[in-house]
Amino acid sequence: MIDVGLRIDVDTWRGTRDGVPNLLSILQRQQTRGSFFFSVGPDNMGRHLWRLLKPRFLWKMLRSNAASLYGWDILLAGTAWPGRRIGQGQAEVIRATARQHEIGLHAWDHFAWQTWAGVWPAERLSAEIRRGVEALADIVGQPVDCSAVAGWRADGQVVAAKQPFDFTYNSDCRGVRPFRPQLPDGSLGTVQIPVTLPTWDEVIGSSVTREGYNDFILDQITQHQGVPVYTIHAEVEGIVLSEMFERLLVEAGRRGIRFCPLGELLPQDVTQLPVGKIVRGHNPGREGWLGCQQLS
């Protein structure tokens, strides 16, 4: 049996309202658990439209057919009107998720983090994390013990800003296996569980067809030499591609693949994990920089 961490990112109002309940039903039918990471502040995702001026982002939007994939309400959210507070309006969905699955913080404001985390000072990074942690903890009535930054926008400064929150683990970068990140001061930080597999929007339309996507991902898992972690999005696999995602789970079971919460991938003794750093890098199919694992 191959254990694969299932990370579910929830970026928007619609993804929370519509995508998460669909995913909860699918996961219950397939007797599968995962880790949901919620954005809980304003939904300003439509403000990413300016990035269409960047060729790599424009190509990504075109090949993934973003308008039909996400819907115009997501693509325009927070542009002509203030973004709705996701946690405030969709609290019951988040609480229902917490009763069945591992949950953690994705972001307070997903758009702001993805756009500005690379230039914010440490104080602003800490304030954004704290705002999201406090909002999510108030919703679920329990401490938040894991997190995964929006857009994998993480580096040494971001990892250091997370230290005071005492998370059990973070999932802030792309890589091959769990590790202990070295902080800028030389000390070791909270365990990182990197995402190791490509997402739908990174490969569709370039090297993979819609019809061949499930086989592609399952083949990637069986060939993986590290600790596989797969990310889906409530806005995609929870809505337009929900039937395809359920077929993926069914076929995974036939191939001896078990999806699980990320926390279940941690060894009993985390001090035995390798040491490394999170550095800025690039990933095929994704516009802009993101955090990448660099093992010592």
From Swiss-Prot:
* Residue span(s) of domain NodB homology: 2-260
Its UniProt entry gives the catalysed reaction(s) as: 4-deoxy-4-formamido-alpha-L-arabinopyranosyl di-trans,octa-cis-undecaprenyl phosphate + H2O = 4-amino-4-deoxy-alpha-L-arabinopyranosyl di-trans,octa-cis-undecaprenyl phosphate + formate
* InterPro entries given in the database record: ArnD (IPR023557), Glyco_hydro/deAcase_b/a-brl (IPR011330), NODB_dom (IPR002509), Polysacc_deacetylase_ArnD (IPR050248)
**Which branch of life, at top level?**
Bacteria
Annotated pathway = Glycolipid biosynthesis; 4-amino-4-deoxy-alpha-L-arabinose undecaprenyl phosphate biosynthesis; 4-amino-4-deoxy-alpha-L-arabinose undecaprenyl phosphate from UDP-4-deoxy-4-formamido-beta-L-arabinose and undecaprenyl phosphate: step 2/2; Bacterial outer membrane biogenesis; lipopolysaccharide biosynthesis
Per UniProt, which keywords does this protein have? Answer: Antibiotic resistance, Hydrolase, Lipid A biosynthesis, Lipid biosynthesis, Lipid metabolism, Lipopolysaccharide biosynthesis
Identify its protein family: Belongs to the polysaccharide deacetylase family. ArnD deformylase subfamily.
The protein's name is Probable 4-deoxy-4-formamido-L-arabinose-phosphoundecaprenol deformylase ArnD
Lineage of source species:
Bacteria, Pseudomonadati, Pseudomonadota, Gammaproteobacteria, Enterobacterales
